[in-house]
Amino acid sequence: MVKNNKRKRVVIAMSGGVDSSVAAALLKEEGHEVIGISMQVWDYTRFTAEEGEKFDTCCSLDDIHDARRVAEQLEIPFYVVNFEEEFQNLVIDDFVNEYLLGRTPNPCVRCNQWIKFELLLKKARGLGADMIATGHYARTEQDADGRYRLMKGVDPAKDQSYFLFTLTQEQLAMTLFPLGGMTKQEVRALAAGYGLRVAEKGESQEICFVPDNDYVRFIEEERGKQLLSGNIVDRKGKVLGVHDGTYRYTVGQRKGLGIAHPEPLYVLGVDAARKEVTVGPRDALYSDGLIATAINWIAPTPETAIEASCKIRYRHHPIPCRILPLADNRAEVRFTEREKSVTPGQAVVFYDGDTVLGGGWIEHAVNTKTAVSHE
């Protein structure tokens, strides 16, 4: 787990959950100088839960209190840093903008990219830290040539490498993932063994700043109800109905279309500029590949096409594909077999076995008849 056996000053990102708490305990047990930091990124007073209800998210004030108590139990220094403004500008605004542009964003990747492994890393350096650590289920290894590899966590049900594809070599060199070689069951057992008060705490399920999972309400609270109402059309452009806003729809969606039709209809595409939602039968959801932008290669950048596997969403089994690097930091990905619901705005992550090669953001799906510019 640790890059070498020397005692290091390590800043651990503590969410108040069982994973980061056990990671902190493991680092302390290994003899490192551990500093706990919780990031305050969101004002939870904006939401009021029903009596007896608790939102399944991370990073709330209750979670920060849990993290503080764990740090006290472990006898490590603990700080809270306020990143609310940065989180709003870098994560929330991006989330809302993507939906308004007709795409389906992944804010957890953006949070890792800009908050945890950018701002927190800078804060850690300011504290004189040698490394940062998180409770992610992922692994790193250093090759003989000094290059770092990002790898899947050994627990396939918990692997979080998909969310970390934006990491750079510099960031990987300063990052520890103490839980990467463990299963969730083993982590909970360790938490109980350490006597941590969060040993039985539930897991966060929803996006932290949308605790009730109502994206439409959140977007309208952020920006007001958008004037993006328009037509629902079939693949030939025939109007089948109307909608109240393109941001209410995502590729693959079936419910909430409000259209009477002899066969089930699914969202095939969202065109915010035209204010159109295109629908069609289930088999029309399948694509031959995709174009990805803003590619980050963790492995050396390939000069020609490579055979690999890819995931087009988090809970997606890696599928065989051929990746062709294009100009302007783009790539064309061709699947061995047609794949369902390629969704613009989501991340596509490339793998070679357990190793993350890199990844990018899905621009659009590609079908055999789709012209692709390789310029």
Swiss-Prot record:
Question: Any idea which UniProt keywords this protein has?
Answer: ATP-binding, Cytoplasm, Disulfide bond, Nucleotide-binding, RNA-binding, Transferase, tRNA processing, tRNA-binding
Drop me one GO molecular function for this one.
ATP binding
Where is it mostly found? cytoplasm
Catalytic reactions on record: S-sulfanyl-L-cysteinyl-[protein] + uridine(34) in tRNA + AH2 + ATP = 2-thiouridine(34) in tRNA + L-cysteinyl-[protein] + A + AMP + diphosphate + H(+)
Region Interaction with tRNA, annotated ranges: 158-160, 313-314
- Active site, UniProt feature: 111, 208
- Residues noted as binding ATP in the record, renumbered to the chain: 13-20, 39, 135
Can you name this protein?
A: tRNA-specific 2-thiouridylase MnmA
Designated gene of the protein = mnmA
